[in-house]
Amino acid sequence: MKPINPSDRKIANIRDAAFTAFVYPDGAALGDAILQLDDDLELGLGFHVYRMPAGMTTRGHRHNGHEQFLILEGELHESDGTILRAGDLVFYRDGTEHNSYTPNGCLLAVHIAGPEIAVD
């Protein structure tokens, strides 16, 4: 086995790493932020850690590809009334529409296959 080239590995700790503010295509920033090591993908695609501040509601969106996430901290209220808590592993099939609200903030490990499409 050959040694790992330092440029082939990135490591960040979610407790002290710098998150990047997520800015929507229309320029709006709602306070959510992303920690993503793969800079070959657009911010928010592929695997990343997603942080929502207390009181934030995401915009309604449709998934263009599957979404999967694990709630690491906090609580997430889905638009259909489902309440997700730390430890919940969630899968949304391609084409699913929803939005989410967090009363006290939350941290998620997320994989999103493709860009989301805004819906009302």
Predicted regions and their residues:
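Glycine- and acidic-residue-biased ligand/ion/polar-headgroup-sensing regions
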Residues: 54, 63-79
